[in-house]
Amino acid sequence: MIIANGMLGVLPTSLLFSVIREKYSYCYSIYSSFKIYDGIIKIATSCNKENIEKIKELINEQIDIIRNNKFDDNLLNDTKNMYISNYRLADDSISNIMWSNYRESVVNDQRTTDKIIEDFMKVTRDDVARVMNKLVLKVDFELI
């Protein structure tokens, strides 16, 4: 789900950012975040209220693009490469060391950075589509 979420809305190459923010200029910012141990994806945007319905429609379209395996190979490859670079760069940071200790002690995740990178490299188009097909809208919240 990490790669799928990256493709959806984490990175500057993501569908939400490149389509809704850059192509249509419907919002000031838009992103998705994945709560890894809760299995929750949150999508947030800052926009004018007259664009809310258009944005919701476009969000669903971007999710469907991933669900239906209609995305460009470059999006998948760029996303994997960006995450791999970020993991390598952060490997020696204090916050990453603390995160690794948390994963190991609290959730019994013993994977090393190299193993996580190896797992990222194995992610396929079908893997991404499959996990996005499990996505279910639970809450739709607007703060105006």
Describe each PLM feature range.
Residues 1-41, 46-144:
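Mature, solvent-exposed C-terminal subdomains and processed small-chain segments of exported/organellar
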